[in-house]
């Protein structure tokens, strides 16, 4: 997946030199030394000013500073400046979800966003090339706000582009609830044609983006999403079904019966279940291992979708419910038993604060909670107690 622009690290002097060198290769009149010196001067002034307010120079501000200097050092004609900047871009990347570390490309995206919105055709051509070698999501935002109809129409045409990065871009930039940017106010009827155009796309990075987009829309209109995914699944097309499976992931984790029905995953006839947890008491930084055993008559072709649910306690609040994907299998022969395991690492980090005390573990199969157990996180980090064989709780 493309790295969100706001999370990219600030550019160093080497990146500025790379940008200047790239421009000089296509426009020899570029004042390389003046450009670099102005950036160093402006950067020092900006850092000093922000220090008074205890703020730092983030990557977006740094890119804006460089883009401002591009405006003064390139020809005053914006279309001509855009031509120079797009000509100096790296070659299009392979159809991978990862964006190479071309940090010197970021100010070009900022230049397009800040100064090129009056030149729609030239800007769209620049964005088409930029999205194949860097992050162009922010660059197109002004066009979506100022010219939504014709910009969305151009994106719809790009949905047939041979580059998967371009096709993914078409879907990603019009997400109304994208986590990497402010909410985009676009009528849903402008967005839906993009999703339908990519319905049968076979590339994983495109499928992932379409699925995320559908899931976003489903948060405000669940019945619409479920009905549409039932239609897509019913086509029998493996690509449309792959997107539907990914789009419904959140509903599957919550045990939504209709989502399981759409994916044709049926409840199991289980005679006996047992979940073993080892150890029952664990310290910070240690691991908890869980083992599930099922007994029943499972016919060949039976599909099993396993999720592990941990209820993490929180100080004075309702425990946080975290769903972990286990495994999804289809039995290749008749069976009377099924066993699976999962390991949980009890190490806290920035997005996972752990509170000592009892933790409840549930096992969910095909949308139904079929077993549960409990383990305790000790309040003395590193201490190990009762690490021998765990106990079993039958459902």
Ranges and model annotations:
Residues 1-259, 282-283, 300-303:
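Surface-facing alpha-helical segments and adjacent helix-coil boundary elements at the starts of domains
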Residues 348-350, 364-373:
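Short acidic/polar inter-strand loop motif in beta-rich domains
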Residues 270-273, 315-328:
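Short beta-strand and strand-turn-strand segments in soluble, beta-rich domains
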Residues 368-385:
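Short beta-strand elements
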Residues 260-297:
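Surface beta-strand/loop "capping" patches
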Residues 348-358:
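Short glycine/proline/serine/threonine-rich loop/turn segments at secondary-structure transition edges
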Residues 290, 322-349, 377:
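A beta-strand/beta-hairpin structural motif
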Residues 286-295, 299-315:
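Beta-strand-rich binding/interaction modules
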């Amino acid at each position: 997946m493309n790295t969100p622009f706001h999370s990219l690290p600030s550019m160093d002097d080497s990146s500025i030199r790379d940008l200047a060198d790239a421009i000089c290769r296509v426009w020899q009149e570029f004042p390389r030394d003046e450009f670099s010196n102005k950036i160093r001067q402006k950067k020092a002034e900006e850092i000093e000013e922000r220090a008074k307010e205890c703020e730092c120079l983030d990557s977006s501000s740094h890119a804006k500073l460089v883009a401002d200097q591009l405006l003064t050092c390139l020809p005053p004609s914006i279309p001509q400046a855009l031509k120079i900047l797009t000509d100096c871009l790296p070659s299009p990347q392979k159809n991978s979800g990862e964006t190479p570390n071309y940090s010197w490309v970021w100010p070009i995206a900022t230049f397009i966003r800040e100064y090129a919105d009056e030149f729609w055709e030239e800007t769209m051509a620049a964005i088409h090339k930029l999205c194949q070698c860097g992050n162009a999501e922010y660059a197109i935002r002004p066009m979506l706000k100022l010219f939504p109809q014709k910009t969305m129409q151009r994106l719809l045409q790009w949905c047939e582009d041979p580059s998967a990065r371009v096709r993914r871009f078409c879907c990603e930039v019009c997400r109304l609830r994208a986590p990497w940017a402010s909410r985009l106010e676009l009528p849903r009827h402008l967005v839906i044609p993009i999703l339908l155009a990519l319905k049968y796309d076979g590339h994983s990075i495109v499928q992932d983006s379409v699925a995320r987009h559908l899931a976003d829309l489903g948060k405000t209109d669940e019945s619409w999403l479920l009905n549409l995914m039932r239609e897509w699944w019913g086509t029998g097309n493996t690509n449309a079904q792959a997107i539907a499976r990914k789009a419904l992931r959140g509903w599957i984790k919550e045990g939504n019966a209709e989502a399981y029905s759409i994916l044709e995953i049926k409840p199991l006839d289980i005679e006996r279940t047992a979940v073993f947890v080892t150890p029952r008491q664990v310290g910070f930084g240690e691991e908890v291992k869980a083992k599930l055993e099922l007994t029943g008559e499972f016919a060949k072709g039976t599909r099993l979708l396993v999720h592990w649910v941990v209820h993490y306690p929180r100080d004075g609040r309702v425990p946080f419910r975290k769903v972990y994907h286990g495994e999804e299998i289809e039995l290749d022969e008749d069976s009377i038993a099924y066993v699976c395991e999962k390991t949980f690492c009890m190490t806290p980090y920035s997005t996972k604060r752990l509170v000592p005390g009892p933790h409840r573990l549930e096992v969910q199969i095909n949308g139904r909670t079929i077993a549960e157990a409990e383990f305790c996180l000790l309040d003395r980090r590193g201490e190990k107690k009762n690490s021998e064989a765990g106990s079993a709780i039958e459902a």
